[in-house]
Amino acid sequence: MATPMTAAQVVAQLKKWGLHHVEIPGWATHNRAGHGAWGPVNGLIWHHTGADVTDAKAYAAGTLYNGLADLPGPLCHFSIGTDGAVYLVGWGRANHAGGGDPAVLAHVVNEDYAGQMHPTRGNLNGVDGNSHFYGVEIQYSGSHEMTAAQYVAARRLSAAVLDFHGWSEKSVIGHGEWSSDKWDPGYAAGKIMAMPVVRADVKATRAAGPTASVPTPPSTSEETGMKLSDAVTVGPWVKAQWPDDVGLQDGAVSVNTALGSTYGHARAAHEGVDALRAEVVDLRAALAKLTQLLTKGA
């Protein structure tokens, strides 16, 4: 059990763990205060939104912030767009977990379970999860896998939360492990992800620490700053394939060499193909003559 992070603390954690985040206006004080407890907190629940979203910020600022006709917002604390951006939607009690299995809650509190959890209670007959869990809504339908960028961000977000509270990966669960009514986060229609695998990945992410490299999107600029004299790494198979090539033993070649070699080999391959085509034409002509002679002789 733990006191929930403050809004300032969660922003600091996101920055510490290298997560690109977007603050929806008003998020820090937007919550369901007066409609139930908030804290002590025990974990983080992964959700899918149930729909593929084209405008992540608009969805976070609209549906997730305001809620639905029968379920007022905020509907989560965090949301993750397809590009891996983390949106801060609300802070405090949020309508995301609903009712769930008290046995699952006990396991999360004690971090004493193994494998996938299978709840026997749901929203109507379970205990209040909104007071105990942070919630992240990952913006995808659940009928297919989330994007790679979303999975990276969700793991790092989880690690950031665990890092602050000193929890293990067993404080991260899927909504479908909390409530018998749910199956998120999904990878196919009606099928929850293998959460033990997710937890293992979260554990590895946390162990790697906040300074571990984070995949970044490719530059959209034509200017990359790379010089022709800069070195580029070659795969280990290259050295294994040509062990006597001294220039490859340091595992790198210059951009100029790489480009020149690529052009040279491509040119040689092109000329080789042209030569083979010419030989095939000659062979076909010779075969036609031979066939004609054999036919006459018969």
Regions found by a protein language model. Give the residues of each.
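N-terminal catalytic cores of peptidoglycan-degrading enzymes
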Residues: M1-G129
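Basic/polar, cationic surfaces and motifs that engage anionic cell-wall
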Residues: M1-P25, A33-W38, P119-V232, Q249, ...
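Residues in flexible loops and secondary-structure boundaries
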Residues: T54, A94-A97, H144, S180, ...
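A compositional/sequence signature of small-hydrophobic, Ser/Thr/Pro-rich patches
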Residues: L88-G90, L228-S229, T233-V238, W242
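Eukaryotic intrinsically disordered, low-complexity regions
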Residues: V89, S219-E222, Q241, T257
